[in-house]
Every structure is written in structure tokens, then in C-alpha cells.
Amino acid sequence: MPPTAASAVAAASLLLLAVDTANLPAEFSVCKRNAANMEKCVQAALQDVASHLSAGTLSLGVVPLDPLQVPQINIHHVVKYILNIRFRNVRLTGLANADVSNVTADVKTDKLSLVGEAPHILFESDYDMLGKFIEVFVVGSGKCKFVFGNVTAQLRLESERVQRECHVHWRPQRFALEVLSLGSAQLNFGDPLMIGALSLGSNFSQLVNDNWREFWTVLKPTFQERFGLLFLEFAVKVFQKVPLDDVCPR
């Protein structure tokens, strides 16, 4: 990937932008392919892009993406417990506060990787749940609120090059998201859950908070896959309109 897919992956990776024009605005930095300290330039460009997530970018027709809205996420865990959770009307806040580091770019293979660190991410949604966790059978629905602290994740974008109307574009093929570490989690299921005729209510929130690392193992695989696919979708929208030479001039 052209090292300076910076602004582009700024528009694809952390950016997650839906672009309505084929030209990048002046406020987005670009890094020439053969420039010295290329990766530092890319890192600075990506960090700048992250700061645009909350307000969006009018010149690109980009709506605000922090908070990030997701219609639905389905958890079907059968590894250690049998637990099904459906999250609806998901609202994710905190991406714009992420710090970007460890950026690497491979020009020959069209790949980009970076590490993002967010001090906190707020996850809010409606939910319904059925199954078993820590020997407790639960069924219920309502609203939930999770606060994840000190989230560190690695993002890896892989693309191929295609020719479109005399321009070379990226066609993203894979966007891998891996949460490397999670410092803390505060988990609140606001409405009562039931075990038979017994109401768990806040007791279930206490149970998952006392065992939050265990509960995170239930959420993590699906969260990584779902958000990785979502980011890939945004990356495809960006790169099918913005030529590589616009984001990484020769």
C-alpha cells in the first residue's frame, strides 16, 4: 500500500468516511511516496483524521462518526457458555479521542497497519439476552451501557489495486481489527433480567462486573469481526471514489 495511504486510510481506517466527492479537501494532510520519515508523516495524518470524526467533514459530505451508529450486533457464544445476546441501536462514543501509533506501510503489498489507543469508549444499546453465564441462567431485555477503559487495538488494512477511468484506486479486501488489551470495563444492564421467577436486576450487572474479563471473552470475537467488517465497508466507499494519487502523490 502506498505509504501515504495515510489520508486515505484516514478516510478508511480510523476515518471510516462516506465520501461524496473524488477530491480530498485541503485540511487533510498527504505524504509523498518517497518522502523522508514517511511513517511519521502517515501517523500524523491519521491522527489529524481522527480529530475530524466528531464533527464530520462537510467538504466531503461526511456525517459525524463519533458517535458511531450500528443497527445490530449478534453474539452467539458456545465456546464456554451458551449465551445469545442481540444488541440493537448501538451507539459507540470515544473513537475521536484515540491516539495513533506504530504505523507501518508496505508500498509493494498495499498494506497498512497501525495501533489505536482510546482512554475510554462508551457502548450503549438496547439488548435482549438468553443463555447461561458463570452458572447463572439469564433471560431478559432492556438497555445496557458499557464503559471500556484504556482500549488498545491494532488495525490492519489489506488492498489490491484496480484501474478505474484512467485512475488507479485501492480496492480494500480485508480490514482486521484486534483488541490487544483492555484496561477496565464497567458493565451495566439497566433493566432487570430474570432467572425463572427470580429477578436478577443489578445483581447481574454486579456478576458481570466481578467477572468482566470473562464476559469480555464472550463479546470480543464478535465485536472484532463486526467492527472490522464495518470499517472495511467504509474503506471501500472511500477508495472507489478517491484515486491513490490524490492521497499519496508521487
What residue ranges belong to the model's regions?
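A positional/structural detector of protein chain ends, strongest at the extreme C-terminus
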Residues: M1-T4, C248-R250
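Cleavable N-terminal signal peptides of Sec/SRP-targeted secreted and luminal proteins
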Residues: P3-A22
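C-terminal helix/juxtamembrane-tail motif
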Residues: D20, P25, L232-R250
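Hydrophobic-cavity lipid-handling domains and compact docking modules
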Residues: N23-S184
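Sec/Tat-exported extracytoplasmic proteins
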Residues: V42-L53, T57, V208-W212, W216, ...
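Flexible, active-site-adjacent loop/turn segments at secondary-structure boundaries
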Residues: A98, L187, S205-Q206, V242-D245
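Alpha-helix boundary/capping detector
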Residues: G149, L219, D245-P249
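Extended amphipathic ligand-handling, pore-lining, and cofactor/metal-binding catalytic surfaces
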Residues: R171-Q224
